[in-house]
Amino acid sequence: MAIASTLREQAIAPLSRADAERLLPQLSLGRQTIEKRVLRARCLKYVESFDVSWAELTQLLPQVKDRLLAARVAVDLVHLAYYLVRGEEAERITKAAQDHAASDPFLLAELRLGRSINLTAANEVTGALQEARWAEDALGAAPKGRARDLVMTRLQRQLAHLLSHAADYDAARAAADATTRFAARVGDPWETAWATYTGGFVAWMAGRNDEAVDHFTRAEAPLSTYRTSLWRYTLLCLARSRMERGELAEGDRLARQSATGAPEDHGHFALLRGEAEVAELILARAPRGFPADEHFRDFVRGIVRAERGDPRKGVRMLEDVARELGSRGLEHWALGAGVHAAYWREQLVRGAGASRAAQLVRDIGARGGEGFAYYLPDVAVWLGRAAEREPSTRRLARTIRARGEAALRRASTDSEAPVGASELDGATFHLRAVGLTWRELGILRELERVRSEGQRLDRDALAARLGVSPNTLRVHLTRIRAKLDVGEKRGDEVLLEAALAQGSVA
C-alpha cells in the first residue's frame, strides 16, 4: 500500500527532465498499473516523445477515477497541446480539469501555466500574461521545496518570454534572473540550460545583442547533448543575434546548421544579407500558416514590399500589422513595425518619418529596450540619427546609431567571407551530440575546404591556415579521432569521412 501511495504521489507531483530520465527505465518493468502508466507517459513528455505521451494520456484520461490523478493527466495534456498545436483541444481539457485541479496548488499553477503557453502560441499575450499571474498566485499557496522551485522556474521563464513580447524589457530581465535562481535550486542541467537560453532571448528582444550572443553561446553547449528542438532553436537565435551584429557569414552558417526557423525568420535573414528578392521568394513559397504565424509573416512582407519598390503599400501593411499586434499585447513587435513604417515614410516624404523617430526611441527607452523587432542596421542608423536631435532621446539614439553603424561596417568586411553550403552543415547536430566543440568543427570544415580545393593535406599548412601551432592542431585532431571513434585508421582524411557520415544518421 505504501509503495502504491508513493507511486501515486510521484504520478501527481511536478517532474523535471532529470526525474523523467531516472524513472523511465524502471517504469517499463513489472505490472502496469494506472499510476505507473500515467507516470511513464508523463516522463515521455519530458524527454520530448510528445506524440506517444499524448496518445497514452488521452487513452488513460477516461479510465482514471482518482480525481487528483485525472487532473494531473489533464494538466499534462494541456501542456502537450502546445507542442502538438492542438489549441482547441486544450480549451476543452482545461475546462474539464479546473474543478479537480483547484484542490492542489501545484496542479492549479501548472494548469494556468499551460493555458498561458497555449494563449502565447495564439499571439494572445494579454490573456497569456493574466493566466501566468494567476499561476503565480496559485503557487503562492504551495509548500516550499524542490517541487515549488521547479514549477516556479518554468513560470518565471514563461513570464520572461511574455514580458519581452509585451516590451516590458526591465521586468522581463528580472524574470529571466529569477528563472536562473530557481533553476540553480532545482539542480537539473536541463532547467539550467533553459534558464541560460531565456537570458539570451530576453537580451535579444531588448536589443542587447552582445549579451544575447554570450547567453546563447553558453546555452548551446549543454543543450547539444540532449538532441532536442531547443538546441536547434538556440542555434537559430544565436544565428539571428550574430547576423544583426553584422556577422553575416557566421550567422548564415549557424542558421543552416540549426535546420529550423519559420519562413519569416529566413526572410529576415535574407533582408539582413541585403537580398530582398530572396526574402520575397521565401515568403511567397511559404504555405498559408495559422493566423498567429501570418501576423509575423505580414510584418516581414511589409518590409519586403517596401524594399522591392512599393513603399506606400509597405507602409500600409506595416501600420496594419502594428495595430493588430498591439491589440494582442505584442507591443515589442508593434513598436518594431512602427519603426520600419516610419523609416519608409521618410523615404516617401522627407520629414514624415523623422517626426515620429524621437517618440519611438523614447518609448523603447522607457521600456528598457535598446533595439526593435526584425532589426536591420540601416534602419537603426536612420532611427538613431533622426532621434539624436531630441535632447531627451539623444543618449539612447546615439547608442542605437553606433550599433547600427558597427553592424554595417562589420557586414561590409564580412561580405567577402565564403558562406556557401557545406556538407558538414547536415552533420552538425550529430557531431555536437557526440561531443565535438565548435573549434573542432572549424578544423573539420577547413579540412573539407582543403580537399575541395584539390590541395594535398599537410598538417603544417593546415595549422598555418587555422592560425594555431602544429602541436595544438595535433591535440585537436587526436580529440576528434577519439570522439568519432575511427579506431586505428590512419590519416586525417578518415576524420572528415567519419564526420560527413554522421549526416546520414537517422
Predicted features by range, described:
Residues 419-483, 500-506:
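Helix-turn-helix DNA-binding segment
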